[in-house]
Amino acid sequence: MPEPGKRPVSAFTKKPRSVEVTAGSAAVFEAETERSGLKVQWQRDGSDIAANDKYGLAAEGKRHTLTVRDVGPDDQGSYAVIAGSSKVKFDLKVTEPAPPEKAESAVAPTSMEAPETPKEVPALATQLEGNVSSPEGSVSVTQDGSVAGSQGAPDDPIGLFLMRPQDGEVTVGGSIVFSARVAGASLLKPPVVKWFKGKWVDLSSKVGQHLQLHDSYDRASKVYLFELHITDAQATSAGGYRCEVSTKDKFDSCNFNLTVHEAIGSGDLDLRSAFRRTSLAGTGRRTSDSHEDAGTLDFSSLLKKSSFRRDSKLEAPAEEDVWEILRQAPPSEYERIAFQHGVTDLRGMLKRLKGMKHDEKKSTAFQKKLEPAYQVNKGHKIRLTVELADPDAEVKWLKNGQEIQMSGRYIFESIGAKRTLTISQCSLADDAAYQCVVGGEKCSTELFVKEPPVLITRSLEDQLVMVGQRVEFECEVSEEGAQVKWLKDGVELTREETFKYRFKKDGRKHHLIINEATLEDAGHYAVRTSGGQALAELIVQEKKLEVYQSIADLAVGAKDQAVFKCEVSDENVRGVWLKNGKELVPDNRIKVSHIGRVHKLTIDDVTPADEADYSFVPEGFACNLSAKLHFMEVKIDFVPRQEPPKIHLDCPGSTPDTIVVVAGNKLRLDVPISGDPAPTVIWQKTITQGKKASAGPPPGAPEDAGADEEWVFDKKLLCETEGRVRVETTKDRSVFTVEGAEKEDEGVYTVTVKNPVGEDQVNLTVKVIDVPDAPAAPKISNVGEDSCIVQWEPPAYDGGQPVLGYILERKKKKSYRWMRLNFDLLRELSHEARRMIEGVAYEMRVYAVNAVGMSRPSPASQPFMPIGPPGEPTHLTVEDVSDTTVSLKWRPPERVGAGGLDGYSVEYCQEGCSEWVTALQGLTERTSLLVKDLPTGARLLFRVRAHNVAGPGGPIITKEPVTVQEILQRPRLQLPRHLRQTIQKKVGEPVNLLIPFQGKPRPQVTWTKEGQPLAGEEVSIRNSPTDTILFIRAAHRTHSGTYQVTVRIENMEDKATLVLQIVDKPSPPLDIRVVETWGFSVALEWKPPQDDGNTEIWGYTVQKADKKTMEWFTVLEHYRQTHCVVSELIIGNGYYFRVFSHNMVGSSDRAAATKEPIFIPRPGITYEPPKYKALDFSEAPSFTQPLTNRSIIAGYNAILCCAVRGSPKPKISWFKNGLDLGEDARFRMFCKQGVLTLEIRKPCPYDGGVYVCRATNLQGEAQCECRLEVRVPQ
């Protein structure tokens, strides 16, 4: 079955064959055409055959028959049948009748030997079934099972087959050979033959032990022989086969069947097998037992077998063209169609279907269709343009099958034959399929709207939380509704069943929320968009309570107020107050408060029963804050009047205790006094210490008593009763109060009581402690890939208490959130910070902590960026070595890092030495280097390191030492693969042939052409140390030839040959002539062109032109032969023919054309028209409708019309007031069927006047005139 995509070779589907008949009998020739109704002519020796007593002509649909009755020696000769442009020739041979005795003797032995051979038992069964004799030319099975064709089989002079494979039969286990012969005299290349079983199975993929394909070529007869060998045949080998032969421009195929019989012994012949029904009538194949009839045998089927065979072939329905069905079906239907038609080799079917040519129907409505797809950025404009064949055609634009209406965003444009759809401000809703419909045709395209990358405008912030706290990461992107992905340590986060992660969108803001953080949630979190990503670190710490301010011991008197206050790090922590280990229950006098991080216990009207140990225990933490309340009891003793004043304190006056107060707290000194009369209390503060002076011993003192040393102080009197520092005095006590103690309040306070009886004095030392001052800005050093060293100095003032440690914080430079790096206080003045993100700028600050609390933060450090050194370079190789140089080459490191690469350093050292010498001052950005000035013969090791702002990375070292010495390398040409075959270039094209070579030292390069050195300015040679180039700027035919390049080093050389072929367009064919004309066809012949353009002629293009119109139409394209038949011409017309030649460059510039027209005569009597005297139709011009006076309005187009007749057609001229209007662009002149029109565009009053129309031809001249008045509108 021929491939659907190929043009049929002949108009006949069945061709008449040459026959040999006995004299006196009848000869019948049959032919079948492609379609019914096609006119068929029979000829003998070039003369048409008409129906008479000798010849019988019959036509039935597509079937045409020629019968030659009572054949005699005179009837022997050449016959032909013509249908359309196809002509088939065949021969009739007449032989004398053979003696009847020889025929009987030839038949008798065959019938007697038939039952003796076991292999011929199936033939007996065939005879029992009523099988007819095999047709002429069929194959037969020999003793060894081979198939031999009939010696009398005629050759087919039209098809490609000289001998076609015939149907055959074989017994199970036997062998059979099918042969096909193809004539090769007219073929330029060997034909391609394929063997198929069924419709699809290509037997070339089944070649093995039981199936082999052979081919041979007989040079004497120029005949190709192709054979299909089937050995050890099985029942599965039976079926229909097909042989296909194809050349470059022809194709032919032949179907044949193979019947496989079961092996049956001579004594086991079962006559019942002759009456079993088979699945395929007439094929002789035995079916399975499931197809046999149960019950009695039907002997009538045996008698009707032969007739059923003959009728089944005639009544079989026409076979469906499966190729055409598959071509029109979608790929999803391939499997169903293959199943319906019994196709099992789906892979072979798809392979063959893919190789078929798809004949696309050329559009008649569109000259230029839409592209398959368009792409546009979101918010931009797109134009979809088509070009129509009819400029006046109406178009409709569809979007997803719905018609588009014109609006502000959709604009339709029509410019000539172009139709344009413009879509402005494209959005994602415009991403759809679009169609342009013109009448019944349409072209489709698809528009893809590309969104711009979504950028992150505000990055994520690092966070430090405790276990159980809520975490929320927030970022802001450039587009609302953008899709983002959240990742943790590189793994995408999803909404789990526990809803651990919650994602929130608010306009351009995106949030990742973790309700209760756990230790497993710590890590690096990232948000990723189409335009980038942002990273942040989450640190989760276990809860650890810190005490910023502990409770202190108190000493109060009766009826006073006692306040215990402490401050912890967590404001959500609650606690319990204990008194001597028992929980304290609040009442009207005892109050407990919790405000933020401050817990306070207040006791009003202190009594002696309140003196005890008080403790605060935070809930959930193993922590206990304790303090003691001292009750100062005032004892009232009876004293006589005139009692000297006395200050009653627990501490002796000579060595007073230091009273410590925290800055910002309230200081209250309650000093009990006594004396009668009531003493005067004086409070003083020592502000300046003077020089000490020596004093002699008091009078009456012992001699050995040493001199007392006294200090002289400048004292400040404190007597204010209101304000921050105040003194309140009653009869029995004096109270000194300082609100919000400050550092300036620190010092020695003197209390003096006086009355007439005497005085008493006590010194009280007050020390104010505070948080330390803020340390100086920390310094950053040793910055690594994800770590750095932070160093700082102690604070200038420690707050009066030793510094217990330091707290370190960091933040990203563009962020506002500081993240704490340590919970345990740092005792040292340096710390190594880790877990930073490479390439992100950070800042550091530090806090100092003492017993009072934490200082203010230090100024931020200078911004720094963690950057690690790059990795080591890879693939370090030695490219070349000379006596003093070594060429190195390497690749960049696999890990570059955020710091990029500043360059590479190269070093070398002697083998066995550890001292590396720099080979290059500074860094090189290239990945190769030529190290010069090396000692000859030295064995050196080389290493390369990559550098960036973080410093050098790891080195890569050559595996073995390199000997610095020139290596003698044999010259060798490395000819590229595409230069090993003939190099074809078109005339005028540049030629650039680059040939690499090897060899050391540098070889000498020599070019020659046809054995002669190259000369001339048009050919230039360029040589380098590694290659040579042959360059021709503009190629000419003279540059064709054989070029040889030679590389030589001393007595060693290597050669390569290149064949350059410069090709051009061929010259036109020669000597075109008309060989024969018959019916509606003309046979042409020509000779190949004299100049083939220096390349093979690919074919010819044949064109025809009617003598009347001289419009050329292509009849044949890429036609290989030098003769052809042009058919389907019109009777009575004359035609010119011309032929172009083609090669790989193109078609010839000129064509070979017939000089005289070829007329297609009408069959039958030739009509001779009567001769008449020619009439003279010439006539002088005359106006049948003259011009009329008109009055028009200015600004509106006006038309002047008249009608003229004349022969030949007169020349028309228009005048205004005697001036010719032919070159004035404001006037348009028309002439159609004798009607003359003058159009005046937007006339003005100046256009008024007398207009004249003049008509002139060879016979005379005529003119008419009118007056035109142009009125101005009022």
From Swiss-Prot:
Cite the Ig-like C2-type domain residue spans from the record: 8-95, 157-259, 361-452, 452-546, 645-765, 971-1059, 1181-1269
Cysteines joined through disulfide linkages: 436-443
- Where on the chain is Omega-N-methylarginine found, per UniProt? 1241
Q: Where is the composition biased (Basic and acidic residues)?
A: 95-104
Residues given in the record as Zn(2+) binding sites: 212, 214, 227, 229
- Where do Polar residues bias regions lie? 128-149
Please tell me whether the keyword Chloroplast is annotated for this protein. Answer: no
Task: Answer whether the UniProt record assigns the keyword Metal-binding to this protein.
Answer: yes
Stated role: Thick filament-associated protein located in the crossbridge region of vertebrate striated muscle a bands. In vitro it binds MHC, F-actin and native thin filaments, and modifies the activity of actin-activated myosin ATPase. It may modulate muscle contraction or may play a more structural role.
Q: What is this protein called?
A: Myosin-binding protein C, cardiac-type
Q: Which organism is it from?
A: Rattus norvegicus (Rat)
Gene name, per UniProt, is Mybpc3
